[in-house]
């Protein structure tokens, strides 16, 4: 095989020259392959032929070497760089990884590799192999391992081991880490035998093999040879090629074997490739002509596709890339990086395609993201996919294991008894239930859920209502369970599908599925009456302090305007008038007296203005800043005014559990038997403990027998009773007529409803998988929307509030009319006072003039008196009066 590789390497320039010819569109690609990588090299060549187009050709320059030899890697890398390659594909190990990454970062040459992912950031290194750490940790947690041995190959790096040890320290796992990377081939049989004997003494029956295919095959051979470490043992093969190893030897031995697979043979893209791959000639393409492909070979094929796509994108962007005149010595001092290497690195990282290894996408560090790894188990009929792991969904189990033997026949022939409880909207009696029989009498969320579970698990069922109407709690004296939990514990029912909360004490006696609904304890109170805006609610958009500041600002601005107008010489002016034929000048006047200043400021604030304006610069500055001030204030006021006038707010007496615990006026309680009461009884949090102390000693009792009783108590208490219940039920009742309850504050805890089965029931696993599948399909959310909101009776606003919040009533703006009427009345009163005052003054003046006329009745005096009278009379005439 190695001879074939050597011949292909020596003849590669000739072969590729014949295939592609000499073309200006030829792109030189370097290749560093370890000796013995026959299949990887064949996949590389197939990719070159497959993805080359008429636009350009990828021309490879291949070097076959020992990747563990840093000197050989340095020579090969420098040789590739001096040939003017645009990018290099190749492999590395722990001894050569630093050399390659250093050259790439210094010379700006991109290196695409399917080797193990490195920690940290390495510029110009594109890693095709996804990181396995997250999937491995998820699988360990899925199997609930807390003690296991970890056999690792040092050539693959220690990052995965470090992640396992970090999780072990956090979750208190017992991990025995053993390095099998440096085992001498001559003594490997003896070494492995001694190793497994030590594991047997330590009772380590769970083993993780963090090794590549050849090392895994060696270990499996020794396990079979020894014969003691097969049945009852569980092995996890921690690489991405579960089907690459020779598992036939251990398939029927009784051991549990799990692992990971990056190449999904059920995928249509992989199937088409395998059809072509299996037809290739073994002599021309060593390692081909098989029905499978190693995951490293698949990553090699994908790497060629990534490079091709990157150069195609550069062509589309009309970015010219050339190595002419840039091929130099990589050992030059100082090193001269390739100027256009950054463009190629950017193009490679931006590639997103579908390949043999699934979705191929990279982050800014050149590492794979958004990938999916299949979870595999070895069955008697061969490797089988049981689920998958992704960065978003984490581990998802998709294989449903049906009960075997008599359990299957029993499940198919038996009618499963499903216990539940009458609780809206989970289980309700239909209006015409007297005319119906069996399961048709019921409707609700859990009724629909039971039908879906039965359909997925393949059994017939009968719905029964729990006799005592309780969920399930253990009596403190007799230790007997009641409710639905009791029916499961004492064999009266096979499964409970109801709003049954998953708790620790219940989990000790029954099994729960994954939660089908998440919720928490919440507070229900009677909805307070909506407070209508007050008569003077138009003042609410601004706080009381702001209104006071505005008043002081108004007075201050008026005074400042008055003062600057008095001090500024440019504010004084002389009025001229004609007296016969001559023009006369009166004395200097100033329009901005204190009253005119107040009037000017008021007009500006009301956005109206007045008939006078400042003449001086100082006065205009005062006016300008006042206008700016009023612009912002009025705009802010107007923006908030609509909300304050149209929205009828509900003022809740409490907003949280803290508010409840700090007062005694409003009583509060829970269901007398259930998880909510148990939560407060066991809680060590000060607030909840204080609430429990109150509820336990309150008279009359604040506990209720049913949720319906608790809701009725809330509605009849006129706001003096709060009921603590699950948030889902609270939200449902809030949507039911008479729409007089509401949920306040956030949830007090976080928990979930689960489907319960007796301990060890054959239904448990099937039901759990059915719940997961329904959740993935979005059916659980659809059911909740159907029974909570689609059938709601109060609307989104709760009742008939929509029209009330869209139109203003007279009460909203009554204060404005009051001010208008008050202003008009005040104006008339002031006018009357002015008239009376002026009339009295004129009467006195006329009386004085008349007396003077009687004493000295001269014509001049009469004329003067008449002029005086005329002047006073014209106050109410056309002539203006200056203040």
Curated annotation (Swiss-Prot):
Positions of S-palmitoyl cysteine lipidation: 610, 836
Cell compartments where the protein resides: Cell membrane; Postsynaptic cell membrane; Postsynaptic density membrane
Intramembrane segments: 592-607, 608-610
Positions where Phosphoserine occurs in the chain: 683, 717, 860, 863, 880
Entries under InterPro entries matching the protein: ANF_lig-bd_rcpt, Glu/Gly-bd, Iono_Glu_rcpt_met, Ionotropic_Glu_rcpt, Iontro_rcpt_C, Peripla_BP_I
Residues carrying sugar: 256, 370, 406, 413
Cytoplasmic side: 565-591, 611-616, 834-883
Any one cellular-component term (Gene Ontology): endoplasmic reticulum
Parts of the chain on the Extracellular side: 25-543, 638-812
Residue ranges of coiled coil: none
Post-translational modification: Palmitoylated. Depalmitoylated upon L-glutamate stimulation. ZDHHC3/GODZ specifically palmitoylates Cys-610, which leads to Golgi retention and decreased cell surface expression. In contrast, Cys-836 palmitoylation does not affect cell surface expression but regulates stimulation-dependent endocytosis. N-glycosylated.
Binding positions (L-glutamate): 499, 501, 506, 675-676, 726
Cystine crosslinks: 78-330, 739-794
Membrane topology of the entry: Multi-pass membrane protein
GO BP terms, alphabetized: chemical synaptic transmission
Reaction equations catalysed: Ca(2+)(in) = Ca(2+)(out); Na(+)(in) = Na(+)(out)
Region (Required for interaction with IQSEC1): 867-877
Domain of life: Eukaryota
Family affiliation: Belongs to the glutamate-gated ion channel (TC 1.A.10.1) family. GRIA2 subfamily.
Role noted for this protein: Ionotropic glutamate receptor that functions as a ligand-gated cation channel, gated by L-glutamate and glutamatergic agonists such as alpha-amino-3-hydroxy-5-methyl-4-isoxazolepropionic acid (AMPA), quisqualic acid, and kainic acid. L-glutamate acts as an excitatory neurotransmitter at many synapses in the central nervous system and plays an important role in fast excitatory synaptic transmission.
Record remark on domains: The M4 transmembrane segment mediates tetramerization and is required for cell surface expression.
Subunit structure and binding partners: Homotetramer or heterotetramer of pore-forming glutamate receptor subunits. Tetramers may be formed by the dimerization of dimers. May interact with MPP4. Forms a ternary complex with GRIP1 and CSPG4. Interacts with ATAD1 in an ATP-dependent manner. ATAD1-catalyzed ATP hydrolysis disrupts binding to ATAD1 and to GRIP1 and leads to AMPAR complex disassembly. Interacts with GRIP1 and GRIP2. Interacts with NSF via its C-terminus. Isoform 1, but not isoform 3, interacts with PICK1. Interacts with CACNG2. Interacts with GRIA1 and SYNDIG1.
Identification of the protein by name: Glutamate receptor 2
